[in-house]
């Protein structure tokens, strides 16, 4: 199948219908549930419920039935060192991004459905049923929030005047200048008066939601290390279609693969040179190279 703009739009609409008709109602029916049973994926703060697995199964069944030649990568069925992103059309799915939020009843979790071709995001739909926020895009067809085209207002993009999304993440081992120490020192560099002295930072607790809020212009940027392709694939497409860019979280990484695991999302609403200057002013505050 040739992935023309029309085919990409069809996939986008398939994602939207699946999320609105099946996944959203299922997630909402469990909202506020007291989850007494969940797994610790990596440690005590990286959580997964049986609902994550059920949702991924429903998504895979529906998408592979309609597009049997497309590959499928899901967070709950991913096998480290075995599952690879190839050049072929590949669904990249996170059934619940922000599971910890979901378990606590904090309304910032979503389902993230992405399609990649040649290793690049070409369709993305992110649905937060708790807030009824549906972000969607496909390559060449624009980006939308609840069917209204996202148009980021023109305004200067300056690091010191920016609002940035940052997250604590699940890797929190201190010492030996590992990733956790580097991230905490980077946050200090960005926030302190002697550093970048940015306006502030926000944490949605969901990579997909953070990227969508950058895409919509509510946030100026999002810096993260440690997330996975399924956390960023859908949002990345939405970001680019809204005029934003995705670069690496480490210094000088202008062109990164989907599974780089270290990202800097920068909003649109400005010229590309402003985005370039923003990245170049941001990177010196990163306190060491993140390694995953």
UniProtKB/Swiss-Prot annotation:
Query: What processes in GO biological process is this protein linked to?
Result: inositol biosynthetic process; inositol metabolic process; inositol phosphate catabolic process; phosphatidylinositol phosphate biosynthetic process; signal transduction
Alphabetically ordered keywords of this record: Hydrolase, Lithium, Magnesium, Metal-binding
State whether keyword tRNA processing applies. no
Question: Which reactions fall under this protein's catalytic activity?
Answer: a myo-inositol phosphate + H2O = myo-inositol + phosphate
Indicate how activity is controlled. Inhibited by Li(+) and Na(+).
Q: Which GO terms describe its molecular function?
A: inositol monophosphate 1-phosphatase activity; metal ion binding
- Cofactors: Mg(2+)
Reported EC number(s) for this entry are: 3.1.3.25
Organism domain of life: Eukaryota
Detail which positions bind Mg(2+) 2. Answer: 94, 97, 231
Q: Which residues bind substrate?
A: 75, 96-99, 231
**Kind of enzyme, top EC level?**
hydrolase
Q: What is this protein called?
A: Inositol monophosphatase 2
- Organism equals Saccharomyces cerevisiae (strain ATCC 204508 / S288c) (Baker's yeast)
């Amino acid at each position: 199948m040739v992935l023309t703009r029309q085919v990409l739009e069809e996939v986008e609409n398939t994602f939207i219908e699946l999320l609105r008709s099946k996944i959203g109602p299922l997630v909402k029916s469990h909202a506020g549930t007291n989850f007494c049973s969940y797994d610790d994926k990596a440690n005590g703060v990286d959580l997964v419920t049986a609902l994550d697995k059920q949702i991924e199964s429903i998504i895979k069944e529906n998408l592979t039935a309609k597009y049997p030649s497309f590959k499928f990568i899901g967070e709950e069925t991913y096998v480290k060192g075995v599952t690879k992103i190839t050049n072929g059309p590949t669904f990249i799915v996170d059934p619940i991004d922000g599971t910890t939020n979901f378990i606590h009843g904090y309304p910032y979790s979503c389902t993230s459905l992405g399609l990649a071709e040649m290793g690049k995001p070409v369709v993305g739909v992110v649905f937060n049923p708790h807030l009824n926020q549906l972000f969607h895009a496909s390559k060449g067809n624009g980006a939308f929030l609840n069917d209204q085209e996202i148009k980021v207002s023109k305004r200067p993009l300056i690091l010191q005047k920016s609002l940035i999304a940052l997250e604590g993440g699940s890797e929190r081992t201190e010492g030996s200048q590992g990733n956790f120490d580097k991230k905490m020192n980077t946050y200090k560099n960005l926030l302190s008066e002697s550093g970048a002295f940015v306006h502030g930072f926000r944490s949605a607790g969901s990579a997909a939601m953070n990227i969508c809020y950058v895409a919509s212009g509510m946030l100026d940027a999002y810096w993260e290390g440690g997330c996975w392709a399924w956390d960023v694939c859908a949002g990345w497409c939405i970001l680019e279609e809204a005029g934003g860019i995705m670069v690496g979280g480490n210094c000088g990484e202008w062109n990164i693969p989907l599974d780089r695991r270290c990202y800097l999302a920068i909003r649109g609403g400005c010229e590309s040179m402003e985005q370039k200057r923003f990245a170049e002013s941001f990177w010196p505050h990163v306190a060491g190279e993140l390694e995953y």
